[in-house]
Amino acid sequence: MKKDTFTISVYTENNIGLLNRISAIFLKRHINLESFSTSQSEIQNVYRFVIVVKTDAERVRKIVQQIEKQVDVIKAFYHTDEETIFQENALYKVKSSSLFEERQIQNIIKASHATIVTVSPEFFVIEKTGFREDTEKLRKELAPYGLLQFVRSGRISVTKAKMGISEILESFKNNN
């Protein structure tokens, strides 16, 4: 079966243990989570989990159905990359001497459309928002200049098409 990348959005109340129950669904099916992030949704007290997996369409459909059976889950959806607008954020901590001694590093930062967010005598921090390929490319380019730390967020995304979640969340808000 052909594996594709899917973004699963789970709208939920923020209750203890739900993350564990959701991750167990993937564990039982031997599906690795490529990315996971969570945040407040557009409705107060409703949270959104964004989960990225590589699997086939039938398996992701079944996973979403299983997630929706969980208590505390309001609704879950899945989308392909073509159906979403998505980004990741990355931070790079680099030796300060590189910034002042290596002209090339300034060119790399400028060409990648990254931003220097802080500078200290020992290090500076660069922030880059983009696709995983973009943040990974910058990581590889910075490595020879003394990359001290690197961290990348999970995917954040919105759908291109209107989702029916707005009405569901509004109904949820009015009932609680």
Where are these regions (language model features)?
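Long, contiguous binding/interaction regions
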Residues: 1-47, 52-176
